[in-house]
Amino acid sequence: MRDLMRRRLKEKRQLPVLLCGLFLPFGQLAAREADVDRFSASLKIAAVNGVKLHYFQNGSGVPVILIHGGLGDYREWSAQIEPFSQHYRVLDYSRRYNYPNDNSERPDHSAIVEAQDLGALLDALKLERVHLVGYSYGALTALFFATQHPERLRSLTLAEPAIMKWLLEIPGGQAELDKFMTTMWKPAGDAFRKEQPETALRITCDYFSGKGSYDKLPTEGRRLLMSDVREWKALTTSQDPFPMLDRDVVRRLKMPTLLITGEKTLNPLRMIIEELSRVMPAAERVTIPGATHDMWLEEPEACGKATLSFLGRH
């Protein structure tokens, strides 16, 4: 199994373009495709909060909840299921608009809605106190849930949460936010409103990985992105996709917290993680050498080991 994972990672690095982005877990496209059959037979469905969520459980003991990033789904955690489930009961689920869920779209989607879904899912599965591990937009979801239900968390692991509105109060952050919104976010939303999802993905990839990067993707890569495109549409057309998190509320969180960042991450995410470290001075912090925002996909072993080490102490 480990040799297979290593081969998949090698194939991933040989893709024409390694797409790293703010919420985009594209890096391990080939491996994610190969894992469909491996996990699909074990998927279950929970009807919660007016939607149906596909989820996968493995292992036993204290629950660890894995929350994927944007334009991704439960499959992006495939490399973590085996090592994590040796010690914990792992719950890996797809958020409401991500593959293979087929929920009707509702206006003004946000991480607040995702946090409500998470709470309802935990209630349905009778999980009281859990470890939360969130990546990118999934980390933003985890952080909102933590501020609303701190008593339910044993620990909180945040891999570069997209707290975009904090950039407004960080030196140099306004310029980064403006670039993000005007170059990619708003044009992608406009493309979705014109029913042009592939154009929206092309705009997104151009921003994060350079012009023409989408067109260099193999066919299976485009298909995988398209399988999760409904979430991207819901977010880029929302009136408030990045709700403001009150710094004082975050500062009062007392559960053990781990912050994970990539050494070569994007400027806005570096600014946000630095600010989060300042707001949560007791939080532990790990930097993954050589990694971008796609750290969990580029360096799954390093990310997994860092997280398991942290969980083992809490």
Give the positions of each predicted feature.
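Alpha/beta-hydrolase fold catalytic core
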Residues: 4-15, 19-64, 86-88, 312-314
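Conserved HGGG/HGGXW glycine-rich cap/lid loop of the alpha/beta-hydrolase fold
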Residues: 51-107
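Active-site loop/oxyanion-hole signature of alpha/beta-hydrolase fold enzymes
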Residues: 82, 91-137, 305
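Conserved hydrolase catalytic core segment
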Residues: 128-167
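Flexible "cap/lid" loop of the alpha/beta hydrolase fold
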Residues: 153-189
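Conserved alpha/beta-hydrolase catalytic His-Asp/Glu region
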Residues: 193-233
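Conserved serine/cysteine hydrolase catalytic core
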Residues: 221-275
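Catalytic active-site module of serine/aspartate enzymes centered on a nucleophile-bearing elbow/loop
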Residues: 282-314
